[in-house]
UniProtKB/Swiss-Prot annotation:
Disulfide bonds: none annotated. It is found in: Mitochondrion. Binds 1 [4Fe-4S] cluster. Monomer. Keywords: 4Fe-4S, DNA-binding, Exonuclease, Hydrolase, Iron, Iron-sulfur, Magnesium, Metal-binding, Mitochondrion, Nuclease, Transit peptide. PANTHER family: EXONUCLEASE V. The gene is EXO5. GO terms for biological process: interstrand cross-link repair; mitochondrial genome maintenance. This is Exonuclease V, mitochondrial. It comes from Saccharomyces cerevisiae (strain YJM789) (Baker's yeast). Its cofactor is Mg(2+); [4Fe-4S] cluster. It comes from the Eukaryota.
Length: 585
């Protein structure tokens, strides 16, 4: 019986030995509960009855303490398997530290080009970086972050198993749904509509995702000035960073052939707030526009003509939302600084996209082309039909394309005609078979409880023909360039981080935009992504190891941590020796 390790039904280790050791490890290497001060206590038991038998263990199992203890969940087993796979993958790629065998090297793998090409271009097939990727290089430990980037698939799977990550996603989603309920309503309508009409939506996933992002961004930003409550969430933006010098690109170019050395940086802004510039009150319907019988184009023309007046009284604040597991802001300054920089990038991008509408139009097209999309290809007609049925502003706007009329955007109007055609004539068949009336979601007014209205496919029969101007991504890029020009001119120099615990916004940090700080950070991050420098691990102090490494997946295999902790131990011994010798003199 002595020397055996027993596991009770709750997964706790029980050591039936004559001496009870209350330090962090038992003699055979298995972990047991530590005492508060991590001392070792030997409790001699000469009585053989002190050895636990099966009956004793059964009694322990039935103690009240164990009644509230859950057995190990299956997800923990899955998490452990994924972690083992990730560590093996990183070790295989980075290799062992030649100076410290069995521990992972802390320099980039030789024979590979650089993280941007290794991870983004070759592994993920994405010719772009994200704001998050630039900001997370230094927010914690750069070494850990790049280990994770190089094992991205496994790292993401592990993250998705973590409760706090799931909780954070739910909070972001609930805020988006509260501000923009039309998204879920559209998805529900589309699902039912396709089932009833037996239509299919054959559209490439990348095209579908980009189209949804562009459509929603236009709609939400227009709504910010009309019927919205002064808020818009989950808005896409992008900019460029130079591959050679690591500088953010300040001036847009019209041709992708001139920007090959520039890498796209994409981002999604959590929250925009339209407020009065003088009293900081949130502005609802600041443009005072009646949207009935209006179109995107009419509203944008009105906003552009009144931009000077709008700018004199209003501003838009960019916010980033951070979720917390406790109602406290992060105690580590680098984490807060990373969030600030993330918001500064968004501010820079909106400034970049509000310089000139023609250049912004081409910038969005370059973005689409870098994703491998054909900007001249007609968009799936079924997708467009669902937009027409659910969004009157869009439906009224695309009549210009139907009849071959200009949309009052010079770059698009000179660029729109092509050899491709856009034909919705096949939808005439819907009028002779199956249902023709459907309930579609509508924007709710404060004095109305109606969330849907009935529409008839027959009311949209004029669209079911060959259009004179093809509906392509170029149309959406044109409308994006107009609304981003408007919003970019209103963006405030005051930026904000919003901290949420559950659904409670318990703290905000407001801070100024800092061009110099942003430029320095962009260059330093670009250098590591594009191979200009190696990874920078954390400064090797015991405080840092206790703070940064405590929950790191790589803490047991990290050579940087292991080697420097041993140095600190040796240093401690040397200091102790020096003190002892000096005291004896």
């Amino acid at each position: 019986m002595l020397g055996r390790t027993l596991i009770n039904k709750h997964g706790f280790l029980i050591h039936p030995r004559r001496f009870v050791h209350l330090n962090d490890k038992s003699l055979d290497g298995t972990f047991i509960l530590p005492s508060k001060k991590n001392h070792m206590y030997d409790v001699p038991t000469n009585d053989p009855s002190g050895i636990l038998n099966a009956s004793d263990i059964d009694r322990i199992n039935n103690l009240p303490f164990f009644d509230n203890t859950s057995p190990t969940k299956e997800t923990n087993t899955k998490e452990g398997a994924l972690l083992s796979e990730k560590l093996a993958s990183v070790k295989e790629l980075f290799g062992e530290d030649p100076e410290n065998p069995s521990f992972i090297n802390y320099r980039f793998p030789r024979g590979l080009e650089n993280p941007y090409f290794d991870i983004q271009v070759n592994q993920l097939k994405k010719k772009r970086l994200s704001v998050t990727q630039l900001c997370t290089t230094q927010n914690w430990c750069e070494l850990r972050n790049f280990y994770d980037f190089y094992s991205q698939n496994l790292s993401n799977q592990l993250l998705n198993l973590k409760f706090q990550v799931q909780k954070g996603k739910k909070i972001h989603k609930s805020l988006e749904d509260e501000t923009h309920p039309e998204l879920n309503q559209y998805k529900s309508f589309t699902h039912n509509f396709l089932a009833l009409t037996k239509l299919s939506m054959d559209i490439d996933n990348d095209m579908d995702a980009l189209l949804d992002n562009w459509f929603n961004s236009i709609n939400r930003l227009v709504s910010l000035f009309t019927k919205g409550d002064g808020h818009a969430r989950e808005i896409v933006c992008h900019g460029f960073i130079n591959l050679e010098d690591g500088k953010l690109v300040e001036h847009l170019l019209n041709s992708d052939s001139k920007t090959k050395e520039n890498v796209i940086i994409s981002g999604v802004i959590d929250h925009l707030t339209l407020r009065n510039k003088h009293n900081h009150q949130v502005q609802k319907g600041a443009a005072h526009l009646d949207t009935e019988y209006q179109s995107w184009g009419n509203i944008l023309t009105n906003l552009l003509s009144n931009l000077k007046e709008l700018k004199s009284n209003n501003e838009i604040v960019i916010s980033d939302i951070k979720t917390r597991s406790v109602p406290k802001i992060p105690s580590i300054e680098s984490v807060i600084e990373s969030s600030k920089l993330q918001t500064m990038y968004y501010k820079f991008f909106f400034s970049h996209l509000s310089q000139d509408m023609t250049q912004t139009y081409h910038s969005f097209l370059i973005n689409a082309k870098r994703r491998g999309l054909d900007v001249d290809a007609p968009i799936n007609p079924t997708k467009i039909l669902t937009f027409i049925l659910t969004n009157p502003l869009f439906a009224n706007d695309v009549k210009n394309l139907l009849y071959g009329l200009p949309i009052n955007h010079s770059a698009f109007d000179n660029d729109a005609k092509g050899s491709n055609t856009f034909d919705m004539a096949a939808f005439n068949d819907l009028l002779d078979r199956g249902p023709t009336s459907f309930n579609v979601p509508i924007e709710q007014d404060e004095d109305s409880s109606e969330s849907t209205k009935c529409v008839s496919l027959r009311d949209y029969g004029h669209f079911y023909t060959k259009w004179k101007t093809p509906l392509t991504l170029k149309y959406f890029a044109a409308r994006l360039s107009q609304i981003y020009f408007i919003v970019g001119n209103l963006v405030s120099n005051d930026l904000m981080i919003e901290y949420y615990y559950h659904n409670d916004n318990f703290h905000n940090i407001i801070f100024p935009y800092d061009t110099l700080k942003l430029g320095t950070h962009a260059h330093d991050s670009a250098m590591v992504w594009f191979g200009g420098r190696d990874m920078h691990p954390i400064e090797p102090t015991q405080k840092n190891f206790n703070t940064y490494c405590k929950f790191c997946d790589y803490r047991h295999v990290c050579s940087w941590k292991n080697k420097n902790e041993l140095k600190l131990i040796d240093l401690g011994k040397e200091l102790k020796k020096i003190i002892l010798e000096s005291s004896m003199k």
